[in-house]
Amino acid sequence: MIQIHALPAFNDNYIWLLQDLSSQQCVVVDPGDAAPVLEWLAQNPHCRLTDILITHHHNDHVGGVVELKQATRARVLGPAAESIPARDVALADHDRLTVLGLEFVVHAVPGHTLGHIAFYHEDAAAPLLFSGDTLFAAGCGRLFEGTPGQMHASLERLAALPDSTLIYCAHEYTLSNLRFAQAVEPDNQDIAERLAQVTLMRSENRISLPSSLALEKRTNPFLRTRETSVKEKADERSGGQNTSQSAVFASLRAWKDKF
């Protein structure tokens, strides 16, 4: 049985730790800081860290890799197209890897960074997606390296996964993302309900993740660029007609950057 733990780091990062209760092995995703992982391992001394999965090269995702590898000898797997410290296995689009007995498929999702990847585990009951800084709950990552067209294509690719997919992103941005989503679609009842729920959760210091792809399709404006209400708001913001979904996305992203 696999349990997934969220280890908070910095102001709003989550390091995801997957624990196999039967084998007493574990894996972490995007350890920007070694300390929370080492603390968890100290509290669970019978569990051995076997693998470190990396989605992209930003320091808040890789800052703890070297220390963790030195402490545990864990294998480091990360995108081939980026410089990842202490990487043992370079991963490219469509590659398959197995950790804790779970097979993951690598999806190249450029936009936030050019070499960004996501890890997808296909499962009839509960598919899993570790999306890094590409797809957030109710939002998406900033475009530090890629183009709006690249990010839109990456999000469309992830949106094609099963609706039941559970989404484990790397930051607690849900509340601010939902406030933006409500500005885009003020009449969207699903957004209003989710905003109320997450406001309560965060007031009680509860995590708002994981999300699901079905929920994102109802409440995430960056996955709703084909909706008339979203396009109309994007056109209003950009002062003209956005003639493609990619252009709608670009308008929304530029707005969100200043929101």
UniProtKB/Swiss-Prot annotation:
GO biological process: methylglyoxal catabolic process to D-lactate via S-lactoyl-glutathione
Pathway: Secondary metabolite metabolism; methylglyoxal degradation; (R)-lactate from methylglyoxal: step 2/2
Annotated EC: 3.1.2.6
Reactions listed under catalytic activity: an S-(2-hydroxyacyl)glutathione + H2O = a 2-hydroxy carboxylate + glutathione + H(+)
A GO term for molecular function: hydroxyacylglutathione hydrolase activity
Cofactors that this protein relies on: Zn(2+)
Presence of the UniProt keyword Metal-binding in the record: yes
EC category name: hydrolase
Residues holding Zn(2+) 2: D60, H61, D133, H171
Record bears the keyword Lipid metabolism: no
Cofactor note: Binds 2 Zn(2+) ions per subunit.
SUPFAM superfamilies in alphabetical order: Metallo-hydrolase/oxidoreductase (SSF56281)
Keywords: Hydrolase, Metal-binding, Zinc
Compositional bias (Basic and acidic residues): 224-238
Binding-site residues, Zn(2+) 1: H56, H58, H112, D133
Domain of life: Bacteria
Family: Belongs to the metallo-beta-lactamase superfamily. Glyoxalase II family.
PANTHER family per the UniProt record, alphabetical: HYDROXYACYLGLUTATHIONE HYDROLASE, HYDROXYACYLGLUTATHIONE HYDROLASE GLOB
Subunit: Monomer.
Record protein name field: Hydroxyacylglutathione hydrolase
Organism: Pseudomonas syringae pv. tomato (strain ATCC BAA-871 / DC3000)
